Amino acid sequence: MELTDIHCHILPGVDDGADTMEEARKILRLEYRDGVRTIIATPHYREGMFEPAMKQVVKVYIQVREMAREMGMHLYLGCEYHTNSRMVKDLRRRRRPSMVGSSYVLTEFSGAHNYEKIRNQVYDLLTEGYQPILAHIERYPCLREDIQKVRELVDLGAYIQMNAGAILGESGSPIRKFGRQVMEEDLLHFIASDAHGVKYRRPNLGACAKYVSKKMGHSYAEKIFCENPDHILKEARRQANLRARKRNKAKEQTT
């Protein structure tokens, strides 16, 4: 089973993830050893904390993408966007990338955000044609303490991501039990490493995939680690084709 990691802070020097190109290379090696063949790099964007210039992000991404290619891996560019009032406008104007240029958006909240705040942001994104993936929901008490709220967000149209460490129990037994409940109630769409380096929050998708396969079955693990991530890439290709057709049509109208 070839895994896809949709949430990884592998680009050095743009957030609190990898520090150097050498550390990025080590992350790639660990991911490859775990069975990961596709990674979506998701540097943070958080107002007042992580605001890397897009030119720098793209420059570093191209370098790491080449390292990945040499290892037989695919690397794509996304973003972990910490929600703010300008989020939809920034996405529309392409100031920050969605997930691989698709309509999927990896959306982060603060632990202090209440359910109403999360629901309103999900609704706003959906209304504008985006498909929000809620990053590491195990960190949000308002969802962790009431799984019905998770179900309501999924019914609204949101997608749910949890970190591999949380599923494996690295964040404590209560969070591991929450993860098991989310899986058993079929509310989980993605599990990702959220790796930040080789010492702190190392890649661990391989161990998690084995655990999920044992607890939930191989077909369930394939859906979470392979099939659902592939939907992002397919949607990205669809969006790219739409943009290309629009550009061609605009050229035809000016000639």
Name the predicted role of every residue range.
Residues 205, 210-255:
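Mid-to-C-terminal alpha-helical segments outside catalytic/metal-binding sites
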Residues 32, 126, 183-184:
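Non-catalytic positions within long, well-ordered alpha-helices that form the structural scaffold/packing
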Residues 2, 9-18, 147-154, 162-165:
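Metallo-beta-lactamase
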Residues 51-161, 239-255:
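Extended substrate/RNA-proximal surfaces in nucleic-acid metabolism proteins
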Residues 21-28, 87-91, 116-118, 178:
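Short, acidic/polar
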Residues 9-11, 44-45, 78-84, 110-112, ...:
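Active-site beta-loop-alpha junctions enriched in small/polar residues
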Residues 187-203:
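Short acidic/histidine-rich active-site segments
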Residues 1-72:
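An N-terminally biased module of ancient metal coordination in phosphate/nucleic-acid-related enzymes
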